[in-house]
């Protein structure tokens, strides 16, 4: 065999690639949505997938196979006899014969099919108990191809045992993926977790539950009973459509339905369940199903041959079944069972829509599968907040978010969220990576904004590094690293302080010596430079004086300009005889030869050097140089003095650098106490406050006439609450736009029932009995006969969101004031005030993006936020408008499908309908332009039938606040406050440091008065790091204070003004463990009590507390530092021995 040519190799490689591509196209996904908490008795999980079409010749050999690890029920895998009922044009028709009802004929034959959805009795009912899974398929066929739909039903426990597996049907591969949603036990509808509870509509008022539209998949089950008509399902349909006199429909069975993605089986019909009655009525209206065709056939055409009859089974002597013969895109299921037989007769009718009209008596069938929709009441699962934490990993951070009830929404502007999920019980976890830690990590999770302070991560990495460096002394490694790893100038000050304390006796003389050497060299260079400059100036002056008195200084022979008279005289003597005046070596007595010799002569500076030596020699030992040279930097007194001064200065810098910057929102470290304001004039505050921020203002109001009389004043403004009176408009629906052409050769357009006529929203235009040959295909001759029916309808309706219209809006804040012993609270509305005899607090106005008549759309839970629509149609809606398709309690509201039909014709071809109106739903349009709509976030929502309340977490709204306190206060009455407050520290958790934060639990006792509004702070001996406003009642009160800051020696106490608890607690040290994010909304607190800033005494107190904390902490750290100090002093003594005394040095 010869070598393959490059062309053959290329073709072979291309063939392999095409084979791989073909194999990839044969892979289909079947998604099984599971709640992430599986409990016993939760029924079945169901899913389906529509496969590509296959030739009708392959149907009889189809077999559904599985490689999944679950146990498949074998009942549906066996062969079952079907009557194959087909149609064709009669072969004896003459050419150009006009089509009529007698132009077509049908054929019946018996075939065996396996794997179709023929579910025996009790199979579904016992599937959960027996841990059996049911896999089957159904067929939608025309004359040439069939489109299979594969169904998978299994116990919900398979969500735990199976993640992914493969099914196969013919040459198609089906990837079954079990996906756990963020729902605990409910189903994902409209982006929210919905638990359908049908009994709620019977026992509770309508405003206490929600109503959702859910898909229903039903499967026909045959069950024969020996007597009675209880199982004759067709009797129920006939009763429903009020058809009497039908006695021949004796088929016995029922439908078993599954609602949504998982549910308990629903039996249809069932007298004691209104859900069953609803499904039954929908089956009667749409006997072939409410899902009309597959997505890719949304715009297609069909040719109707007409009504046909046939025999089922094929051995019958007369016709027992009828239907509508067609060609073109397949629509509904092509499998059914005959209603007139006691024993089930299964029919497979490719290219025929079998009769399903229950208002007639004969030749009817029931489909083996039925798909539709049903509206059910239920409850929405409550959501919980996320917990987000991060750990440092390489150049970025590894983060994880988890929630007890699932994560319905998570995003981040700084991280890559890959949706890798884990579930532990009811808890959902998502891991993601943040590539940058040079800025704080922001994560939006379950409607909450979480912020992870990345400097805390860097602190952890610093601790890890220093712990590794000091690993030889593990007992002190971590403690020492914790002290050193403090961010900012404070951390550098700590490091310098420890270096000075431990190694100051070595570093001080060493650094001083280096500085002195540099200064001495600089002084010498400056002095040397000045000497040379003066010498050159002197030579120039001598030269100029000689030129003035004696003439030119240029040698006449060599033309060299001399600088002194002796040099010129030597030139005159030597150059004329050809000798060098400098080295006296012989040369030619020419200018060029002598100048060339001067360039290499090494003694040309001989006369300058003689002149320099004749002058006084410079001795650079005076002034600065001498002082620097004689400085005794090794003196013990000098080193000890500098060491003490540096320690004091560094302690001050260390304490001062611990202060944080002033912020508009958040806590600012201050000293103890509160500010004092002399009431010489009225106290007025006028400011703008973000909607998500609370505000605390506390002062001591002082009598200007008597400084001893002071009244405590406390003002508390809570976060803004938005109150909207709403009108529930219903649920916005998305739909697939379908355009169908139905052409048939003869008869009027009303003669047949077209598929869109059972759709909820449709329009139809008929082109009937048109004259002209241009619109007739060759196999349908004739002029002025037949019909082309054009239909537009909306299919695959899907609920996408809740819609509320704002009727009115209010913005409120709760305002509380405490003036002396007087306390007043009121919820203040816009343009409203809280007024007392001395204080007036007004909410003047609000800057808002909401307006009455706006429409709010929620595409998920309320906590996920929503979109604001300024234009929302409520009465006359066109398809494509916001609010075009709405599901309301009164029923479905269909939009106007504005546009006109046009029949496109060509000679000898089937006509095609065209529609020039909009074909994109309003929801799809909104998604394409989602960024153009205003969005808003929601925190702490509360909803009722006609009201919606929430807090804006983004501070996108602002309130204008005005506060006036009159100067005419009754100081004699209000300054005498009988309230006595005692404080005790109960517990603390968290860590000191500005990044991590701590939670201090205080026990506050109030006596001598019934209630008192004040603020309790978390402080150490020097400063305060957090506060909370508390409305104390008589007796014991437990107060939680969240603070950030402090140091390793801080003993956090509970303080009120200048009074603190007797004992304090030490928080944990920051470490390398995961850093948990905090709610941005919780930190939006503005606290202003006018307390003085930390001054000099506060700095020393803070430094002293830190030193005591170090001493009282890990004593080994202090021991190691002292040992290092002693070693450095010994090293200093060895390197810088004491100088002998002057007397001993000059002893005679």
Swiss-Prot record:
Region feature Binding to the ribonucleoprotein, mapped onto this chain: 526-543, 598-615, 602-613, 621-635, 1131-1143, 1131-1148
ITAM domain boundaries = 621-644
Q: Which PROSITE patterns match?
A: ITAM_2 (PS51056)
Give this protein's Gene Ontology molecular function annotations: zinc ion binding
InterPro entries given in the database record: Envelope_glycoprot_Hantavirus, Gc_C_bunya, Gn-B_hanta, Hanta_Gc_N, Hanta_Gn-H, ITAM_motif_hantavir-typ
The segments labelled Fusion loop in the record are 767-787
* Ranges facing Lumenal side: 24-496, 659-1115
List cystine links: 34-159, 68-165, 117-136, 141-146, 183-193, 218-257, 386-445, 390-399, 415-434, 462-485, 745-780, 749-787, 761-894, 775-905, 790-913, 816-825, 833-842, 873-877, 979-1009, 1002-1054, 1019-1024, 1055-1060, 1094-1098
Q: Reply yes or no: does the keyword Lipid biosynthesis apply.
A: no
Which positions does the motif YxxL occupy? 625-628
Swiss-Prot/TrEMBL keywords: Disulfide bond, Fusion of virus membrane with host endosomal membrane, Fusion of virus membrane with host membrane, Glycoprotein, Host endoplasmic reticulum, Host Golgi apparatus, Host membrane, Host mitochondrion, Host-virus interaction, Inhibition of host innate immune response by virus, Inhibition of host RLR pathway by virus, Inhibition of host TRAFs by virus, Membrane, Metal-binding, Phosphoprotein, Repeat, Signal, Transmembrane, Transmembrane helix, Viral attachment to host cell, Viral immunoevasion, Viral penetration into host cytoplasm, Virion, Virus entry into host cell, Zinc, Zinc-finger
Q: Which GO terms describe its biological process?
A: fusion of virus membrane with host endosome membrane; signal transduction; symbiont entry into host cell; symbiont-mediated suppression of host innate immune response; symbiont-mediated suppression of host TRAF-mediated signal transduction; virion attachment to host cell
ZnF segments: CCHC-type: 555-575, 580-601
> Per the record, where is site Cleavage?
658-659
Task: Report the GO terms under cellular component.
Answer: host cell endoplasmic reticulum membrane; host cell Golgi membrane; host cell mitochondrion; host cell surface; membrane; virion membrane
Q: Which residues cross the membrane?
A: 497-517, 638-658, 1116-1136
Q: Which Pfam families match?
A: Hanta_Gc_C, Hanta_Gc_N, Hanta_Gn-B, Hanta_Gn-H, ITAM_Cys-rich
> Glycans attached where?
142, 357, 409, 937
Q: Know the name of this protein?
A: Envelopment polyprotein
Source organism per entry reads Puumala virus (strain P360)
The organism's taxonomy opens as: Viruses, Riboviria, Orthornavirae, Negarnaviricota, Polyploviricotina
């Amino acid at each position: 065999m010869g070598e393959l040519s490059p062309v053959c190799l290329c073709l072979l490689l291309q063939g392999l690639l095409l084979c791989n591509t073909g194999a990839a196209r044969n892979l289909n996904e079947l998604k099984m949505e599971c709640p992430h908490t599986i409990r016993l008795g939760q029924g079945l999980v169901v899913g389906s997938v529509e496969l590509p079409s296959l030739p009708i010749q392959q149907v009889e050999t189809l077999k559904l196979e599985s490689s999944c690890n679950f146990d498949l029920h074998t009942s549906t895998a066996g062969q079952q006899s079907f009557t194959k009922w087909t149609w064709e044009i009669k072969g004896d028709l003459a050419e150009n014969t006009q089509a009529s009802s007698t132009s077509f004929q049908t054929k019946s034959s018996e075939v065996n099919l396996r794997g179709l959805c023929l579910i025996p009795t009790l199979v579904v009912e016992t599937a959960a108990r027996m841990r059996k899974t049911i896999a089957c398929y159904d067929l939608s066929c025309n004359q040439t191809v069939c489109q299979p739909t594969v169904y998978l039903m299994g116990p919900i426990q398979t969500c735990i045992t199976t993640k992914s597996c493969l099914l196969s049907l013919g040459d198609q591969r089906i990837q079954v993926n079990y996906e756990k949603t963020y729902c605990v036990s409910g189903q994902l509808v409209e982006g929210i977790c919905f638990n359908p509870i049908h009994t709620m509509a019977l026992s509770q008022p309508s405003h206490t539950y929600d109503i959702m539209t859910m898909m229903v998949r039903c499967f026909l089950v045959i069950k024969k009973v020996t007597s009675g008509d209880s199982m004759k399902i067709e009797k129920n349909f006939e009763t429903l459509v009020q058809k009497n006199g039908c006695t021949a429909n004796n088929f016995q069975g029922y439908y078993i339905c599954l609602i949504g993605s998982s549910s308990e089986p629903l039996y249809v019909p069932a007298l004691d369940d209104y859900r069953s009655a609803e499904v039954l009525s929908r089956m009667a209206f749409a006997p072939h199903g409410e899902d009309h065709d597959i997505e890719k056939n949304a715009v297609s055409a069909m040719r109707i041959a007409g009504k046909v009859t046939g025999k089922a089974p094929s051995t019958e002597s007369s016709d027992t079944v009828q239907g509508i013969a067609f060609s073109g895109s397949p629509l509904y299921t092509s499998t059914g069972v005959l209603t007139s037989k006691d024993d089930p007769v299964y029919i497979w009718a490719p290219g025929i829509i079998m009769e399903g009209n229950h208002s007639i008596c004969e030749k009817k069938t029931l489909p083996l599968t039925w798909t539709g929709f049903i509206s059910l009441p239920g409850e929405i699962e409550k959501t919980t907040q996320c917990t987000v934490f991060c750990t440092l990993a390489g150049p970025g951070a590894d983060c994880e978010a988890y929630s007890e009830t699932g994560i319905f929404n998570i995003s981040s502007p700084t991280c890559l969220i890959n949706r890798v999920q884990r579930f532990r019980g009811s808890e959902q976890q998502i891991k993601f990576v943040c590539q940058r830690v040079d800025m704080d990590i922001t994560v939006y999770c379950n409607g909450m904004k979480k912020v992870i302070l990345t400097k805390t991560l860097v602190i952890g990495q610093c601790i890890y590094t220093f712990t590794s460096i000091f690993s030889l002394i593990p007992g002190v490694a971590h403690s020492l690293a914790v002290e050193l790893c403090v961010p900012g100038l404070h951390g550098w000050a700590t490091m310098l302080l420890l270096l000075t304390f431990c190694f100051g006796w070595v570093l001080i003389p060493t650094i001083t010596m280096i500085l002195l050497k540099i200064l001495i060299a600089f002084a010498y260079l400056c002095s040397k430079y000045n000497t040379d400059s003066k010498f050159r100036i002197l030579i120039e002056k001598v030269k100029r004086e000689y030129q003035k008195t004696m003439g030119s200084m240029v040698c006449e022979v060599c033309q060299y300009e001399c600088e002194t008279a002796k040099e010129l005289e030597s030139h005159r003597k030597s150059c004329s005889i050809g000798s060098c005046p400098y080295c006296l070596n012989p040369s030619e007595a020419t200018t060029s030869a002598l100048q060339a010799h001067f360039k290499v002569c090494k003694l040309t500076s001989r006369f300058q050097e003689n002149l320099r030596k004749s002058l006084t020699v410079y001795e650079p030992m005076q002034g600065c140089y001498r002082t620097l040279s004689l400085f005794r930097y090794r003196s013990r007194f000098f080193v000890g003095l500098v060491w003490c001064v540096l320690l004091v200065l560094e302690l001050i810098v260390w304490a001062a650098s611990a202060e944080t910057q002033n912020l508009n929102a958040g806590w600012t470290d201050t000293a103890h106490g509160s500010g004092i304001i002399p009431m010489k004039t009225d106290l007025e505050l006028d400011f703008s406050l973000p909607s998500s921020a609370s505000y605390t203002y506390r002062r001591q109001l002082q009598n200007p006439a008597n400084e001893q009389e002071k009244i405590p004043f406390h003002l508390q403004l809570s976060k803004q609450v938005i109150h909207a009176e709403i009108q529930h408009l219903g649920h916005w629906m998305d739909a697939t736009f379908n355009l169908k052409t139905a052409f048939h050769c003869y008869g009027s357009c009303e003669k047949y029932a077209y598929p869109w006529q059972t759709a909820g929203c449709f329009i139809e235009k008929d082109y009937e009995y048109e004259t002209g040959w241009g619109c007739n295909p060759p196999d349908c001759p004739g002029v002025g006969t037949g019909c082309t029916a054009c239909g537009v309808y909306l299919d695959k309706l899907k609920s996408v969101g809740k819609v509320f219209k704002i009727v009115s809006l209010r913005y409120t804040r709760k305002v509380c004031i405490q003036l002396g012993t007087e306390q007043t609270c009121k919820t203040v509305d816009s343009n409203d005030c809280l007024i007392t005899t001395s204080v007036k607090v007004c909410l003047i106005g609000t800057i808002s993006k909401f307006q009455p008549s706006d429409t709010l759309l929620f595409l998920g839970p309320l906590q996920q936020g929503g979109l604001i629509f300024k234009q929302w149609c409520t009465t006359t809606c066109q398809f494509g408008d916001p609010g075009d398709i709405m599901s309301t309690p009164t029923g479905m509201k269909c939009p106007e499908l504005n546009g006109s039909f046009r029949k496109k014709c060509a000679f000898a071809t089937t006509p095609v309908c065209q529609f020039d109106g909009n074909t994109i739903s309003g929801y799809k349009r909104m998604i394409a332009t989602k960024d153009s709509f205003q969005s808003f976030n929601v925190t702490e929502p509360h909803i009722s039938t006609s009201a919606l309340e929430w807090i804006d977490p983004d501070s996108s709204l602002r309130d204008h606040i005005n506060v006036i306190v009159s100067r005419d206060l009754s100081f004699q009455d209000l300054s005498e406050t009988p309230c006595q407050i005692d404080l005790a520290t109960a517990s603390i958790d968290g860590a000191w440091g500005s990044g991590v934060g701590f939670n201090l639990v205080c026990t506050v006792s109030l006596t001598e008065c019934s209630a008192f509004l004040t603020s309790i702070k978390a402080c150490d001996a020097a400063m305060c790091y957090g506060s909370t406003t508390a409305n104390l009642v008589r007796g014991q009160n437990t107060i939680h204070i969240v603070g950030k800051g402090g140091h390793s020696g801080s003993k956090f106490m509970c303080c009120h003004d200048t009074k603190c608890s007797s004992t304090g607690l030490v928080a944990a040290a920051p470490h390398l463990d995961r850093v948990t994010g905090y709610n941005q909304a919780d930190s939006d607190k503005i606290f202003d009590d006018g307390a003085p800033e930390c001054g000099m005494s506060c700095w020393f107190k803070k430094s002293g507390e830190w030193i005591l904390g170090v001493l009282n902490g890990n004593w080994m750290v202090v021991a190691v530092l002292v040992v290092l100090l002693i070693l450095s002093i010994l090293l200093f003594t060895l390197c810088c021995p004491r100088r002998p005394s002057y007397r001993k040095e000059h002893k005679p």
